[in-house]
């Protein structure tokens, strides 16, 4: 969540194992996906991040970045919804 003013949240909740494997392009892409996810459900960026982290959406974005970044952000959000739902998420 670079540049979002959430540095305290980032320090508290970020799994730095993800950060060490992310390229300089993945970080802004992940940030954009988190923000778009929040907009889709009218929730804060913080809540979107916490939800995606809890239901493995962040891990999904990291693992499948090579395929996901070629699609639109909206398509990535659609994929996140499905992936999180398959991991116990409740937003749809």
Predicted regions and their residues:
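Short, Lys/Arg-enriched N-terminal segments with co-localized hydrophobic residues
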Residues: 1-21
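C-terminal alpha-helical interaction appendages
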Residues: 14-92
